[in-house]
């Protein structure tokens, strides 16, 4: 009677699928990667954000209020999320932020900003100006 030597950790997963906490892999990102069989067999890269508009939207944010800025660019309620990312299966999710003080700000709608959710002037670049509204950069 002989035992087959396991080539750890992949054989361990198939022999004992209910054990997701492997001692050799104690970091959370590794545990999630191993336990998610769906992601392993059906990988899905997130879609690229699309240009919603080529100019920012200026509005007043109220202190203490939480906002959800649309990252995917598909929302009909720009610059805020309306859940379109979920129904179109983009793999993206909104950026949740809380206003620290009441003030007027420019929120990005080209989705190319380096300081989300705030506009940094990237919409003036040639790449954004050449892109069509509704197309990815």
From Swiss-Prot:
PTM annotation (N6-succinyllysine): residues: 65, 124
Residues binding [2Fe-2S] cluster 2, per UniProt: 108, 110, 119, 123
Residue numbers binding [2Fe-2S] cluster 1: 70, 72, 81, 85
Subcellular location, principal: mitochondrion
Entry GO MF terms: 2 iron, 2 sulfur cluster binding; metal ion binding
Record's protein name: CDGSH iron-sulfur domain-containing protein 3, mitochondrial
Function text: Can transfer its iron-sulfur clusters to the apoferrodoxins FDX1 and FDX2. Contributes to mitochondrial iron homeostasis and in maintaining normal levels of free iron and reactive oxygen species, and thereby contributes to normal mitochondrial function.
Cofactor list: [2Fe-2S] cluster
Cofactor remark: Binds 2 [2Fe-2S] clusters per subunit.
Alphabetical list of Gene3D superfamilies matching this protein: CDGSH iron-sulfur domain, mitoNEET-type
GO biological process: protein maturation
InterPro entries: CISD (IPR052950), FeS-contain_CDGSH-typ (IPR018967), MitoNEET_CISD (IPR042216)
Keywords attached to this entry: 2Fe-2S, Acetylation, Iron, Iron-sulfur, Metal-binding, Mitochondrion, Transit peptide
GO cellular component term of the entry, any: mitochondrion
Subcellular location: Mitochondrion
Assembly description: Monomer.
Sequence similarity: Belongs to the CISD protein family.
N6-acetyllysine, modified sites: 65, 96, 124
Domain of life: Eukaryota
């Amino acid at each position: 009677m002989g035992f087959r030597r396991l080539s750890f950790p992949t054989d361990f997963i198939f022999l004992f699928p209910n054990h997701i906490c492997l001692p050799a892999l104690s970091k959370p990102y590794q545990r999630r990667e191993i336990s998610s069989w769906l992601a392993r067999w059906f990988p899905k890269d997130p879609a690229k954000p699309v240009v919603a508009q080529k100019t920012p939207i200026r509005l007043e944010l109220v202190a203490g209020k939480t906002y959800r800025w649309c990252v995917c660019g598909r929302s009909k309620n720009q610059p805020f999320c309306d859940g379109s990312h979920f129904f179109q299966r983009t793999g993206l999710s909104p950026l949740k932020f809380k206003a620290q003080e009441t003030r007027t700000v420019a929120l990005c709608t080209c989705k190319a900003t380096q300081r989300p959710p705030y506009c940094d002037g990237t919409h003036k670049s040639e790449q954004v100006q050449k892109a069509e509204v509704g197309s990815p950069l």
